[in-house]
Amino acid sequence: MTQHLTAETLRKDFLAVFGQEVDQTFFSPGRINLIGEHTDYNGGHVFPVAISLGTYGAARKRDDQVLRFYSANFEDKGIIEVPLADLKFEKEHNWTNYPKGVLHFLQEAGHVIDKGFDFYVYGNIPNGSGLSSSASLEILTGVVAEHLFDLKLERLDLVKIGKQTENNFIGVNSGIMDQFAIGMGADQRAIYLDTNTLEYDLVPLDLKDNVVVIMNTNKRRELADSKYNERRAECEKAVEELQVALDIQTLGELDEWAVDQYSYLIKDENRLKRARHAVLENQRTLKAQAALQAGDLETFGRLMNASHVSLEHDYEVTGLELDTLVHTAWAQEGVLGARMTGAGFSGCAIALVQKDTVEAFKEAVGKHYEEVVGYAPSFYIAEVAGGTRVLD
């Protein structure tokens, strides 16, 4: 599933499915978050990178008002046809709800999409892995529409439309990190993003003799059906309770002193744990960015470890599979740090590993994980990529 495609292959595949030559081909990356988990909807900082696993697209404008979607990942669904005038969420339309949502909100924003198009998609992000296949597809759709219809579309506006699609069309109360990382990514750079202001820095990702290993639990996770929305609601309630004494809008405005000082205002122990994670994770992200800028990878790794402990015990979004991967990774030679990445509840973890120990690392972690969980994990080396773009 990690096959990379060329523009030429995409053209051939498009022709085989739709019987027409393609207009243009595209690539949209996935993302991992180095640190700063569940902070994006809490007004905190995040530190993601776009990666070379992602979503490929090929498209051709039509002369009528019909959208035709085909995914090589869901061949059994065949070509799904949708009238351009009827862009509403329909469960049976499966993956096409993501592009439908983006097109709906582009039109709502005043962008003229006056014809249908044929849209071929292939993703090599493992499904349900938490590497943002949905956001990758959302930003891909926007860039396809931008080029087919010559839209005057600022990339940040498209990022916001991707989030709007996730929140108001699909029904997941996610933050803006995934779409931002995918839309604004740059080669060999991490994005240090303040989700409260959307101010960001592109930070050189110099890992020296280390690589980021992505560890996939291979346990499916459906974000919309998980406890993700529940965690967000708990944090929003904690903010309401703190507003009795504090002039704040988000947990990201607090430091660790404040969350301790005013903890008595939060009436539920679980909500206090959620709030503590959001505040301290934001502080860890500030420190991690400074450590990376200074070339201090040992400190960066320790902050990764502390992040996972907080996600495990305070935010409670890890579970057996992620904890087994991360705890086993911590015990291996050559590992500077490891943590879950993404929303949690399965999906993936990452580890910062010395290059010359990677093979031994994969063997040891994979063996122990299979003994505990009953099936094998998958491993990928995270290659940092640029944002969504035209291939040819």
From Swiss-Prot:
Record's catalysed reaction(s): alpha-D-galactose + ATP = alpha-D-galactose 1-phosphate + ADP + H(+)
Enzyme class label: transferase
Matches recorded under InterPro entries: Galactokinase (IPR000705), Galactokinase_bac (IPR022963), Galactokinase_CS (IPR019741), GalKase_N (IPR019539), GHMP_kinase_C_dom (IPR013750), GHMP_kinase_C_sf (IPR036554), GHMP_kinase_N_dom (IPR006204), GHMP_knse_ATP-bd_CS (IPR006203)
Pathway given in the UniProt record: Carbohydrate metabolism; galactose metabolism
Keyword Phosphoprotein attached: no
Family the UniProt entry places it in: Belongs to the GHMP kinase family. GalK subfamily.
GO MF terms, alphabetically ordered: ATP binding; galactokinase activity; magnesium ion binding
Binding positions (Mg(2+)): 134, 166
Keywords: ATP-binding, Carbohydrate metabolism, Cytoplasm, Galactose metabolism, Kinase, Magnesium, Metal-binding, Nucleotide-binding, Transferase
GO terms for biological process, alphabetical: galactose metabolic process
Keyword set includes Transferase: yes
Pfam families (alphabetical): GalKase_gal_bdg, GHMP_kinases_C, GHMP_kinases_N
Residues that hold substrate according to the record: 37-40, 228
Protein name according to UniProt: Galactokinase
Primary role: Catalyzes the transfer of the gamma-phosphate of ATP to D-galactose to form alpha-D-galactose-1-phosphate (Gal-1-P).
Location(s), subcellular: Cytoplasm
List of residues binding ATP: 71, 128-134
Site (Transition state stabilizer): 31
Listed GO CC annotations: cytosol
Location of the active site: 178
Primary location: cytoplasm
HAMAP family tied to this protein: Galactokinase
NCBIfam families: gal_kin, PRK05322.1
